[in-house]
């Protein structure tokens, strides 16, 4: 009977291990962030590779010193930006969700990444606190259509004031 009980538990243990492993995946972190605050995440799934390549295609990477990303989430764009970013450049990723920032800091081991918990509306203060006076590029993953009234306009104005 003990052998039978051990076999019975083997299935659930395997399931628990599988779920625990997936709990740290980017997809799970993204979904959890969406379920926690759908207004601020704005999507159930991260962007596709095709979209990423189209968005990053026009960037003149050899001229970039500072790239800013709003709403990096689990790093769907962060990783490809870092793949293309020159060795002497920086990426400042700003997100209001501290869980996403913590995930990026743990998951991406790149000294060029500066992950900040904060609002994109404070981009001027954030980049200046890291020694920059302007950004060469700003990429936004923010769900502007679901942001509270006035926040989108404030972010737009702040962005216009820091972009080169």
Where are each of the predicted segments found?
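Class I SAM-dependent methyltransferase Rossmann-like catalytic core
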Residues: 29-62
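N-terminal auxiliary segments of SAM/dcSAM-dependent transferases
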Residues: 2-26
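Conserved SAM-binding loop of SAM-dependent methyltransferases across substrates and taxa
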Residues: 74-86
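S-adenosyl-L-methionine
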Residues: 101-132
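A short SAM/SAH-binding and catalytic strip from SAM-dependent methyltransferases
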Residues: 136-150
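A short glycine-rich, Lys/Arg-flanked "PGG" loop and its adjoining helix->strand segment in the class I
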Residues: 153-164
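Conserved SAM-binding motif I beta-strand of class I
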Residues: 90-95
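Conserved class I S-adenosyl-L-methionine
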Residues: 63-73
